[in-house]
């Protein structure tokens, strides 16, 4: 059955990944030793999307874990589900990338990449019908961004027809972990535009805001943030893993969400998000879920969908509910907020319904939207990039690893082109007789 191979790289990717596997194990009733302890046959029905069955009925995650330093891996291995992973699938170096994209992409990472690819091949051969890859990484550091994008391009070469989905943590607007984030992120986006099929854009600040505002946590930890991310990750693939009335998979998601190949950066959201104390005061209904799901405060990246327009969106509901009600709510959203949807793609919201809700909830929903307002993220990173690059600040760290300034210039212009493309489709209307020949003719006359 349609397997997904999960790859996590760098500190951020490994921490998100660890949380994700906790969630998936919980949903499928797999305990930390890989033994199935669940009660429902539906948990086992398509457990092989994410798990491989080993001898003795053990379920082993189809996961490849990579990093350029051993630290995060060690703590993951001694964590709550460390024993479930296949020991050979931990691939790590000793030196670390030191937040340097060039080290991850060209020097340290390039030395380690072949052993990672061997593990990926071995896992891919274990699949009946591999659907695609999902990669967790951050774009601000060195390993997740540099080596992560290197791995994505290598996998793209070897498996050109498989879906490539990434969960990418972008640098936050106000909270910066590393000074050279804008460089690393811009160089990574340059790669992701060309080599990934779908990118779910996340950032820590938006996740902090959700924890503060909605979940009422006074000092949220990275564990809390990662839990939000893993709820979304599980929602995106729930239709593959559990029976449902309206199914979606990675490819259907891409076909329905990507009107133009380069515009594949999505905002994600999850509902219901309620603080522990106020849970019993809320009824979980489809209208309630829909309302929270489309709420701008619920988006897991620091871009405000009200500043742009939705090209397309997808809503995945989980739990027992009437599909008629789901469809009514979706039409309702589009009618009430028609100015926030581009009018030249009619009916641009896809919905799917999966019967099995997440553990502990009666129903839930995951939102994935392709909104032109995502350009805010790129624009912000690009401004910071330009400010530093104009003075050539910190550039020697990259050039000493063999990089060329040309590459920076290319990445910068690719990012700016992306912003311009989003802007162009935000302003486009259905009446525009958009004809490229006219533009060319006008340019010739001028």
Curated annotation (Swiss-Prot):
| Compartments reported by the entry | Cytoplasm, Cytoskeleton
Superkingdom: Eukaryota
Against SMART domains, the record matches this protein to: Tubulin, Tubulin_C
Keyword Transmembrane helix listed? The answer is no
Q: Is Magnesium given among the entry's keywords?
A: yes
Q: Which GO terms describe its biological process?
A: microtubule cytoskeleton organization; mitotic cell cycle
Composition-biased stretches, type Acidic residues, lie in 429-446
Region Disordered: which residues? 426-446
Chief localization: cytoplasm
Residues where GTP binds: 11, 69, 138, 142-144, 204, 226
Q: In which tissues is it expressed?
A: Expressed in anthers.
What induces or represses its expression, per the UniProt entry?
Answer: Down-regulated by abscisic acid (ABA).
One GO MF annotation is: structural constituent of cytoskeleton
Against SUPFAM superfamilies, the record matches this protein to: Tubulin C-terminal domain-like (SSF55307), Tubulin nucleotide-binding domain-like (SSF52490)
One Pfam family name is Tubulin
Entry's InterPro entries? Beta-tubulin_BS, Beta_tubulin, Tub_FtsZ_C, Tubulin, Tubulin/FtsZ-like_C, Tubulin/FtsZ_2-layer-sand-dom, Tubulin/FtsZ_GTPase_sf, Tubulin_C
Q: Which cofactor does it need?
A: Mg(2+)
Q: Which GO terms describe its cellular component?
A: cytoplasm; microtubule
List the PROSITE patterns.
TUBULIN, TUBULIN_B_AUTOREG
Family label: Belongs to the tubulin family.
Which named protein is this? Answer: Tubulin beta-8 chain
To which species is this protein native?
Oryza sativa subsp. japonica (Rice)
